[in-house]
Amino acid sequence: MRLIQNMCTIAEYPAPGSTAADCCLGAAGRRLVKIAVVGASGVGKTALVVRFLTKRFIGDYERNAGNLYTRQVHIEGETLAIQVQDTPGIQVHENGLSCSEQLNRCIRWADAVVLVFSITDHKSYELISQLHQHVQQLHPGTRLPVVLVANKADLLHVKQVDPQLGLQLASMLGCSFYEVSVSENYNDVYNAFHVLCKEVSPKQQPSSTPEKRRTSLIPRPKSPNMQDLKRRFKQALSAKVRTVTSV
């Protein structure tokens, strides 16, 4: 899979035929793949999405912004339009999983789901089984493609979840598993999305097919400016250089 350079970040799911849709989805007839990234708060969902789409790690993100990112990818000889929906963190209460209607709409909208937990947070791992069941319940009669991602693999000194547990869980759920460090390794992040796109793409209709859902998936999400992301990345890089120089 090869990422194509132009990328859009949009606050609402664009109506087909609109300027935003033309910008983000490209030429008519290109298949559209819609992916929702879901997990507990603080596991690195936004960082994972931005890393995949830009190859960069900034390290400073606004939590629970609920942004919808769009770009084109080239996979096995075909150019796809891919939309990745970042979602607010899921809360767990005594009565079980607490999913807002906005989150449910995102999951129903998606063609595939990335389930994310952090190796530094065992509760985020425990949440995955319930979350996977909830995802499948929102897609009755079909088995939605899913990939399981364990993030923060570089933080071994505070690890609470061993890789073997992730593998066992993925085997039980019937999905692929990747342990990644979003901050240090782009290739593992790339591979996780690559596998998911391969599972989804043969089944999808061209992006010119009218979409029933034209409303915002999450009300009034704040759409980050990509120039601002680049600026913050440069600032973070400059700060690291100054630190090394002063030592």
Curated annotation (Swiss-Prot):
<feature type="binding site">
    <location>
        <begin position="151"/>
        <end position="154"/>
    </location>
    <ligand>
        <name>GTP</name>
    </ligand>
</feature>
<dbReference type="GO" id="GO:0003925">
    <property type="term" value="F:G protein activity"/>
</dbReference>
<keyword id="KW-0547">Nucleotide-binding</keyword>
<feature type="binding site">
    <location>
        <begin position="86"/>
        <end position="93"/>
    </location>
    <ligand>
        <name>GTP</name>
    </ligand>
</feature>
<dbReference type="GO" id="GO:0005525">
    <property type="term" value="F:GTP binding"/>
</dbReference>
<dbReference type="GO" id="GO:0005160">
    <property type="term" value="F:transforming growth factor beta receptor binding"/>
</dbReference>
<dbReference type="Pfam" id="PF00071">
    <property type="entry name" value="Ras"/>
</dbReference>
<feature type="region of interest" description="Small GTPase-like">
    <location>
        <begin position="28"/>
        <end position="245"/>
    </location>
</feature>
<protein>
    <recommendedName>
        <fullName>Ras-like protein family member 11B</fullName>
        <ecNumber>3.6.5.2</ecNumber>
    </recommendedName>
</protein>
<dbReference type="InterPro" id="IPR051065">
    <property type="entry name" value="Ras-related_GTPase"/>
</dbReference>
<keyword id="KW-0342">GTP-binding</keyword>
<dbReference type="InterPro" id="IPR005225">
    <property type="entry name" value="Small_GTP-bd"/>
</dbReference>
<dbReference type="InterPro" id="IPR027417">
    <property type="entry name" value="P-loop_NTPase"/>
</dbReference>
<dbReference type="InterPro" id="IPR001806">
    <property type="entry name" value="Small_GTPase"/>
</dbReference>
<feature type="region of interest" description="Disordered">
    <location>
        <begin position="202"/>
        <end position="228"/>
    </location>
</feature>
<dbReference type="GO" id="GO:0030512">
    <property type="term" value="P:negative regulation of transforming growth factor beta receptor signaling pathway"/>
</dbReference>
<feature type="binding site">
    <location>
        <begin position="39"/>
        <end position="46"/>
    </location>
    <ligand>
        <name>GTP</name>
    </ligand>
</feature>
<comment type="similarity">
    <text>Belongs to the small GTPase superfamily. Ras family.</text>
</comment>
<keyword id="KW-0378">Hydrolase</keyword>
